[in-house]
Amino acid sequence: VPMGTMATRLGLVGDARFLLQPGLEIRSTGDLTLVNDWNLSSWRFDGAPAVVSLRAAGNLTLNATLSDGFDGVLPTSALRSDRSASLRLVGGADLAAADPLAVLGGGAERTDGDVALAVNKLVRTGTGDIELAAARHFDLGAGATGVNRRTAALYTAGRATSTDDYPQLAGFTPPSGTGVSASYPTGGGDVRIQAGGDVLGGITHQLVTEWQQRRGRTSEAGTLLSSQNPSWWINFGNFQQNVGALGGGDVAVSAGRHVHNLSAVIPTSGRPGGRPRR
């Protein structure tokens, strides 16, 4: 049924208090494994993104990238400016429960019920939320040890903005140069991670400045000292610091037992307008 037809039947057409959003759920009474990259940016229903749920009564293993809010699945893919999907990822799911995030009991003593994200893979979206629930463990960077685990990442990114969105940025000179990929996102979703056992992150020696970059200078008097306005931004292609809400939003992590080597970040981006003083 088209989304517009459903809104009409519910009497919600033109009512700004309601948001009608499609849902897609894949469930398994055993294990569930994602083996191919999913680019959800083309998954729109009457223009609306979906709430995508992957629920496994056993283990949920993500051996591929799950992405929305970007043009593609590569770390360097461009951030989009439209709304994006919300993601629900559940291992050890209680499939009989009304709550889509409900998990079976037992916690760390269980023999299954994990959610695992493989190395070099991403789970990300833009304006949607990421909700992850594991009856036992959440393993970020599964299949590797030491610093190699850091190559997996889970984050919300917000949506891309332009200077046209903000009249006060008239005269802003964007950063340029080799390797510069500036993005000033807004409207990012929340990240919520809950495990009955452990949350296992990836050891990272990465500096924040590797993915939160900056350009431009001013004097103490506020005069521009370069041709580029001072600004700082997110370089999504370089982000390898575990978990983040990179374009707004909150991060919440809870574990029934331990949290190991997990980095969680909530950065900002900014850009002032104006022109060099003559």
Whereabouts are the PLM-identified features?
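Low-complexity, glycine- and small/polar-enriched segments
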Residues: 1-278
